[in-house]
């Protein structure tokens, strides 16, 4: 099994961490969840804009028009899919001040699971493609994806457990969204494999960079602010950028990057 595929599987499996937290009743503080989402956004933004897009543009045979065009395509593609998907977000379930009826919770959780699954599928592809092109960047993307998968698993498992009283059912529903990400990585592994030219890989990387930027500014940062409105998610973003940037410098200094 390839290392990029293993990274994708581990990132998707992080959903189960949130699921177990949801059924065990040990919910992390909103401040910690918000910081982790901002941290993940910072990692994604720095890797996308400072590493992935420049690397794609520098690839042999890649034209600036194609490179920037694929980046814009990734941005617009994300926003297009976001408008088409069911608009239930983790904060819709994590911040209920009045406890809804069990059936209402279950229905909302199912819609949320569907939306997150469709949203996670291309993330699995993105993680695999990035790690296949550059393993160093793949580690960073996998870490960022794993960090924001934890509150997603928590957001689904908690309400389903409240509605059904079954820990197994709650973990199952939460795990579906994580499995969708793993499925995306497996399909990318089966379809792409080694039969892809450097230009095509660079074009895909540019599109993935656009998707990651859109995900960070449209989903992760607003979600962090909604989960913890009393604190600025920018602190998490800055920390994520700083840690990722410092680690990249260390790797490059050591001759690994």
Swiss-Prot record:
Changing residue 181 to Q: Retains both Fe(2+) binding sites and has the same binding affinities for Zn(2+), Cd(2+) and Fe(2+). Decreases Zn(2+) uptake but does not affect Fe(2+) uptake. GO terms for cellular component: membrane; plasma membrane. Disulfide bonds: none annotated. Changing residue 123 to A: Mediates some residual Zn(2+) and Cd(2+) transport activity, with no transport of Co(2+), Fe(2+) or Mn(2+). Eliminates binding of Zn(2+), Cd(2+) and Fe(2+). One of its GO terms (biological process) is zinc ion transmembrane transport. Zn(2+) binds at residues 123, 148, 152. Changing residue 62 to A: No change in activity. Changing residue 89 to A: Loses Co(2+) and most of Fe(2+) transport activity. Does not affect Zn(2+), Mn(2+) and Cd(2+) uptake. It is a multi-pass membrane protein. InterPro entries: ZIP, Zn_transptr_ZupT. Changing residue 89 to R: No change in activity. The keyword Cell division does not apply. Uptake of metal ions is decreased in the presence of the ionophores FCCP or CCCP, but no clear contribution of the proton-motive force could be demonstrated. Bicarbonate or other ions do not influence metal-uptake. The proton motive force but not bicarbonate or other ions might be involved in ZupT-mediated metal-uptake. In an alternative model, metal-uptake might be driven simply by the concentration gradient of labile transition metal cations. Homodimer. Belongs to the ZIP transporter (TC 2.A.5) family. ZupT subfamily. This is Zinc transporter ZupT.
């Amino acid at each position: 099994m390839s290392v990029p595929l293993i990274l994708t599987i581990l990132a998707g499996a992080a959903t189960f961490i949130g699921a177990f937290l949801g059924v065990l009743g040990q919910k992390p503080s909103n401040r910690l969840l918000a910081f982790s989402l901002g941290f993940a956004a910072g990692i994604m933004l720095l890797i996308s804009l400072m590493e992935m897009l420049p690397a794609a543009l520098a690839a042999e045979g890649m034209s600036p028009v194609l490179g920037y065009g694929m980046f814009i395509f990734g941005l617009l593609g994300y926003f297009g899919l976001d408008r088409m998907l069911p608009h239930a977000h983790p904060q819709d379930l994590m911040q209920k001040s009045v406890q809804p009826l069990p059936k209402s919770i279950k229905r909302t959780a199912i819609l949320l699971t569907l939306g997150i699954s469709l949203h996670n599928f291309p993330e699995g592809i993105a993680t695999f493609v990035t790690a296949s092109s550059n393993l160093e960047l793949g580690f960073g993307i996998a870490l960022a994806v794993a960090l924001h998968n934890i509150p997603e698993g928590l957001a689904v498992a908690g309400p389903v457990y409240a509605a059904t009283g079954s820990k197994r059912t709650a973990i199952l529903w939460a795990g579906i969204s994580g499995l969708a990400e793993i499925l995306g990585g497996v399909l990318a592994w089966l379809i792409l494999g080694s039969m892809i030219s450097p230009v095509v890989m660079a074009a895909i990387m540019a599109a993935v960079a656009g998707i990651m930027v859109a995900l960070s500014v449209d989903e992760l940062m607003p979600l962090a602010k909604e989960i913890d409105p009393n604190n600025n998610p920018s602190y998490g973003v800055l920390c994520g950028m700083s840690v990722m940037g410092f680690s990249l410098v260390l790797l490059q200094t050591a001759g690994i990057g």
